[in-house]
């Protein structure tokens, strides 16, 4: 029998051609990062990961990593108070501009600013897919849902519910 992570990964792979924006949410240790890593490995394509980090001083900074840099264990320095689209543009100049998968980690932090920047970021990569990863938060989920971002939970759905929705081809909505 498949594990919960494998079932969710199967759903994401199956639906990959249909979603443009997806919010993968779950508590710490629920497998969100593992799922994102598996999607990166699927096609061995370039992936850009943006991680929003909030320091103890309350300042937000983006850390931008492409797939090669992540494999080497190095990270670019963070820029404080810069917009997501600007960091994405910087990353695109360093990597393949046809990057198909953009992962935005910690999307629950400062989510309204992410939503503001997302349209500009999408215009930079018109054929890309954006996978937002974060913790469950009703306000964040509601705001993302209003923007048409598909929600996928790693923790609240039972394996049976997820398998049933895969078999029926239904959209998972929480």
Where are these regions (language model features)?
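Conserved P-loop NTPase "ATPase switch" module shared by AAA+ and STAND
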Residues: 91-114
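Phosphate-binding P-loop
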Residues: 13-19
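Conserved catalytic segments around the Walker B and adjacent sensor/switch elements
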Residues: 41-56, 61-62
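Conserved NTP-binding/hydrolysis module of P-loop NTPases
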Residues: 55-93
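Sensor-1/coupling segment of RecA-like P-loop NTPase cores
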Residues: 109-110, 121-145
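Conserved small helical "lid"/interfacial subdomain of P-loop NTPases
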Residues: 153-174
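Walker A/P-loop nucleotide-binding motif
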Residues: 19-36
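N-terminal pre-P-loop "Q-motif" helix
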Residues: 1-12
């Amino acid at each position: 029998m498949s594990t919960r992570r494998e079932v969710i990964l199967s759903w994401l792979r199956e639906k990959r051609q249909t979603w443009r924006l997806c919010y993968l949410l779950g508590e710490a240790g629920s497998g969100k990062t593992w799922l994102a890593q598996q999607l990166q490995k699927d096609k061995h394509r370039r992936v850009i990961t943006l991680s929003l980090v909030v320091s103890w001083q309350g300042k937000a900074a983006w850390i931008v990593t492409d797939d090669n840099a992540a494999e080497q264990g190095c990270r670019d320095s963070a820029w404080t108070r810069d917009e997501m689209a600007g960091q994405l543009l910087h990353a695109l100049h360093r990597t393949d501009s046809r990057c198909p998968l953009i992962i935005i980690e910690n999307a629950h932090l400062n989510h309204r600013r992410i939503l503001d920047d997302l349209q500009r970021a999408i215009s930079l990569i018109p054929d890309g897919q954006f996978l937002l990863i974060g913790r469950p938060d009703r306000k964040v989920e509601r705001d993302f849902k209003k923007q048409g971002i598909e929600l996928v939970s790693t923790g609240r759905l039972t394996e049976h519910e997820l398998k049933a929705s895969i078999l029926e081809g239904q959209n998972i909505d929480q």
